């Protein structure tokens, strides 16, 4: 049996992972599960999967979790330290589905633990960790298998390396507002942004999809993860979300990965890698249409911004700044403190106003840049978006 941990087991990716593990209980021994604050669901998952450890980051719910697991023998860890403790458990496979930059430190602990495969759903770890994180995976001989459907697709095609690759293409659904005019985008609501046409996702990533910042972050992730220059990475809009990634080779051949739009498929691949496990999903192309279009950079400027970041003199630092500012702006949008179109404006202004450039040699360097960027973004929102102060 494979020993496995699932960090962020109560989020959208985590729940899908748990569903798959429940169907494959004879294949996996669940060592640890974690959540930020959803103690009730975590306790239920831990009992169903006979987990050895659980961790809850929010100390406020420690007592509730402890009481929910009385008599089970399941060990409870709490706070940031508790999360790092379970991240440090040596397992065969660790699924990291913690949302945002909060996932970076646990990933670093997983790498140091002796775990050999990380099924990674946290793109921010690659975006912000950059070469520092990837160098550490090489030193420790750790394989990252991406769960993001686009990077999972590219990963599958590039199993023999990226030699002779001309370009990689990441597909984007276009999000909730693909066909909205610029004028319509000025008045969209939080509820509308969370109603994704093809994917069932969490709040933050649904908003990122609507602004196309999700794809902007994925471009940076692809650059770092696959060691491919920015000018060889392209994003196109594919509303049906059937083709997840395309690799174009120098001889003119194009390799595309097709699958239904359900995260259970790339999660299953990551769980089973380097093998494959049977799933009931059967794609019938006779009942599908495949359409493509260029992204509209005027309505969705995030893609252009990510390329500017990658082509800047300090791409690693600016990637951290971009991610931090976006997390702040999305949070304010979800709280109705700023409008939809102001999300990317805040991000762009934060990148433009950040000037504390230093070498990035440690996790603390990344965290310091992240914190300073958040402070700048919050100040921009306070001063520029006066209607919401």
Swiss-Prot record:
Function noted in UniProt: Catalyzes the NADPH-dependent rearrangement and reduction of 1-deoxy-D-xylulose-5-phosphate (DXP) to 2-C-methyl-D-erythritol 4-phosphate (MEP).
Gene Ontology annotations of biological process type: isopentenyl diphosphate biosynthetic process, methylerythritol 4-phosphate pathway involved in terpenoid biosynthetic process
Family statement: Belongs to the DXR family.
Enzyme superclass (EC): oxidoreductase
Binding-site positions, 1-deoxy-D-xylulose 5-phosphate: 123, 149-150, 173, 196, 209, 214-215, 218
Name listed for the protein in its UniProt record: 1-deoxy-D-xylulose 5-phosphate reductoisomerase
Positions that bind NADPH: 10-13, 38, 122, 124, 202
The EC number(s) this enzyme carries: 1.1.1.267
Annotated keywords: Isoprene biosynthesis, Manganese, Metal-binding, NADP, Oxidoreductase
Reaction equations catalysed: 2-C-methyl-D-erythritol 4-phosphate + NADP(+) = 1-deoxy-D-xylulose 5-phosphate + NADPH + H(+)
């Amino acid at each position: 049996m494979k020993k496995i941990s699932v960090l962020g087991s109560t989020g959208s990716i985590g729940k899908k992972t748990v569903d798959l593990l429940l169907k494959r209980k004879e294949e996996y021994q669940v060592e640890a599960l974690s959540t930020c604050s959803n103690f009730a669901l975590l306790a239920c998952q831990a009992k169903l999967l006979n987990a050895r450890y659980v961790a809850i980051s929010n100390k406020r719910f420690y007592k509730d979790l402890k009481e929910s697991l009385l008599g089970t023998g399941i060990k409870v860890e709490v706070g940031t330290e508790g999360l790092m403790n379970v991240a440090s458990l040596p397992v065969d496979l660790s699924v990291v589905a913690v949302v945002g930059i909060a996932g970076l430190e646990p990933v670093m602990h997983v790498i140091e633990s002796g775990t050999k495969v990380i099924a990674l759903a946290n793109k921010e770890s690659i975006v912000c960790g950059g070469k520092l994180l990837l160098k550490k995976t090489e030193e420790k001989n750790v394989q990252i298998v991406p769960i993001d459907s686009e990077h999972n697709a590219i990963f599958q095609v590039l199993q023999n390396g990226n030699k002779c690759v001309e370009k990689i293409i990441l597909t984007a659904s276009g999000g909730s507002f693909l066909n909205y005019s610029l004028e319509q985008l000025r008045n969209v609501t939080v509820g509308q942004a969370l109603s994704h046409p093809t994917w069932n996702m969490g709040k933050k990533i649904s908003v990122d999809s609507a602004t196309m910042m999700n794809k902007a972050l994925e471009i940076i992730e692809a650059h770092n993860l696959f060691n491919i220059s920015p000018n060889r990475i392209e994003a196109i809009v594919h509303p049906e979300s059937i083709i997840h990634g395309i690799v174009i080779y120098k001889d003119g051949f194009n390799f595309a990965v097709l699958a239904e739009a359900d995260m259970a498929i790339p999660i299953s691949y990551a769980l089973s890698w380097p093998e494959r496990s049977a799933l009931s999903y059967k794609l019938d192309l006779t009942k599908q249409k495949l359409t493509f279009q260029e992204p509209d950079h005027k309505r969705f400027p995030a893609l252009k911004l990510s390329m500017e970041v990658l082509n800047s003199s300090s791409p690693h630092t600016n990637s951290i700044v971009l991610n931090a500012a976006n997390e702040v702006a999305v949070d304010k949008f979800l709280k109705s403190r700023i409008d939809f179109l102001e999300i990317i404006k805040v991000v762009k202004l934060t990148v433009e106003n950040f000037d504390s450039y230093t070498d990035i040699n440690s996790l603390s360097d990344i965290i310091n840049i992240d914190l300073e960027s958040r402070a700048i973004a919050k100040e921009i929102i306070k001063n520029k978006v006066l209607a919401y102060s």
